[in-house]
């Protein structure tokens, strides 16, 4: 949640000086995906999209015996009331606020200059509806900030159910009855784990489940390393180095034209001539649609990113009573707002040129080391069928980047990541990576003892820089050596 807030602050900085010229909307896979489903513009708050994936055939002579899983918590409520701070900003322009001030014993003339100016600009009918929708979303979230929603609980129950369905051999082996599950101490991560395990108990009732949090280091020494990697000191955090994405953002955001939103959400209550959205000076009368000129200049473009940031929490709730906020934006506007966030995610968490890759080194390496060690123990013959880890996007993204999996493997300037490293395909709510281990059932000459395939959000993926043994299956020794090399490099 802290990193999400940091991204939000970066977004606001990037939007302070947006140019107002419109460019042609770029083509590309991310744009096409958002066009297909606008809610994907929510980035890390986009809800999990289960896929009815057709898995590759299991290689002859092999059978799955062990699963290593690392997942983000499911859909959650907004982190705090600060996620709805834009409501206070919009209230300055709301007719309900002006009516309240008239009823007040305080002389309206004594109000601040800011309040007086806001009365010259008010919310349109659509703007008032938007404000009502935001208030409704905030009220729906109060008392539940940061908690897992029922939608998030379903996401993890369904992932658990599909895991048991796809790999019944793993959860029916009498010699491997143990399942070890661990989460961070966050309530939403714990609740995600509990929902996953409740479904597992229905589908594989004879498994012996050990459930831990990161506090339980006496019972499970790797509890912290498995869920959040190596701890970062305050000094390390202070000295993290990230490339400046503001120039790239400024170029991208030329396509974001706030005039339509200004005209949609605000009106000017004056006799001034206001620049119309078609760019011509037009006397529009006493009440005019608002565009970026005259009184409209008092409204900063950052208010629109605040609206989108607050409104996108609706998808995590999944209740029909909660309004859909995408109706206020065009797909183009959603796309451009999304590009800023995904660039910041890449610059901070992945193998971005100019970064020191601190999060890959601390978070990613610690988790990946645990994955390797626990897999080797399972291969050596312990009784564990699955290691399940429940954590956060802050740790999942660096892990995926360090592993070099398809869709998170790009190394280069941030601007090149737009269609290569897409946040809603990597760290959506309940996002996960699973390593499925297959053991050779009989002696076969020149065949690896253990094969592994990698799933990202339950879809088979490759590591572009490492050749598989066959299809999407890797020789575990090759994959392990590759991971160890990546840890050493980063």
Please place each PLM-identified region on the residue numbering:
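Bacterial Sec-dependent N-terminal signal peptides
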Residues: 1-26
């Amino acid at each position: 949640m802290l990193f999400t807030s940091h991204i939000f602050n970066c977004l606001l900085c990037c939007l302070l000086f947006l140019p107002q010229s419109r460019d042609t909307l770029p083509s590309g896979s991310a744009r096409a995906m958002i066009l297909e489903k606008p809610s994907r513009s929510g980035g890390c708050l986009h809800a999990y999209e289960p896929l009815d994936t057709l898995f590759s055939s299991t290689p002859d002579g092999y059978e799955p015996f062990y699963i290593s899983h690392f997942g983000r918590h499911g859909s959650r409520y907004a982190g705090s009331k600060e996620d709805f701070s834009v409501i206070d900003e919009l209230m300055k322009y709301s007719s309900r606020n002006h009516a309240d001030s008239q009823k007040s014993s305080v002389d309206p003339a004594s109000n601040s200059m800011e309040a007086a100016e806001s009365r010259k600009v008010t919310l349109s009918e659509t703007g008032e509806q938007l404000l009502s929708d935001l208030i409704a979303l905030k009220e729906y979230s109060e008392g539940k900030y940061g908690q897992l929603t029922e939608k998030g609980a379903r996401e993890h129950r369904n992932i658990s159910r599909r895991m048991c369905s796809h790999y019944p051999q793993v959860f029916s082996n009498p010699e491997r009855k143990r399942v070890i599950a661990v989460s961070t101490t966050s309530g939403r991560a714990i609740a995600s784990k509990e929902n996953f395990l409740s479904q597992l108990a229905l589908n594989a009732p004879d498994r012996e489940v050990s459930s831990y949090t990161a506090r339980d280091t006496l019972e499970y020494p790797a509890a912290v390393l498995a869920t959040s990697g190596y701890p970062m000191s305050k000094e390390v955090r202070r000295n993290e180095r990230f490339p400046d994405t503001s120039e790239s953002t400024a170029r991208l955001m030329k396509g974001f034209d706030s005039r339509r939103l200004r005209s949609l959400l605000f009106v000017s209550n004056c006799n001034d001539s206001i620049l119309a959205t078609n760019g011509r000076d037009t006397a529009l009368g006493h009440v005019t649609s608002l565009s970026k000129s005259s009184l409209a200049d008092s409204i900063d473009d950052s208010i629109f990113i605040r609206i989108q940031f607050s409104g996108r929490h609706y998808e995590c709730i999944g209740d029909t009573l909660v309004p859909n906020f995408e109706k206020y934006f065009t797909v183009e506007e959603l796309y451009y707002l999304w590009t800023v966030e995904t660039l910041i995610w890449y610059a901070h968490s992945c193998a971005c040129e100019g970064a020191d890759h601190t999060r890959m080194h601390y978070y990613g390496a610690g988790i990946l080391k645990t994955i390797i060690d626990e897999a080797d123990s399972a291969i050596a013959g312990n009784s564990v069928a699955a290691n399940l880890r429940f954590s956060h996007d802050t740790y999942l993204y660096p892990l995926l980047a360090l592993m070099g999996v398809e869709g998170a493997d790009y190394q280069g300037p941030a601007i090149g990541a737009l269609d290569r490293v897409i946040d809603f395909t990597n760290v959506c709510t309940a996002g996960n990576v699973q390593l499925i281990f297959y053991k050779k059932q009989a002696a076969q000459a020149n065949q690896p003892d253990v094969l592994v395939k990698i799933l990202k959000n339950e879809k088979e993926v490759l590591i572009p820089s490492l050749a598989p043994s066959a299809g999407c299956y890797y020789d575990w020794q090759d994959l392990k050596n590759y991971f160890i090399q990546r840890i050493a490099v980063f």
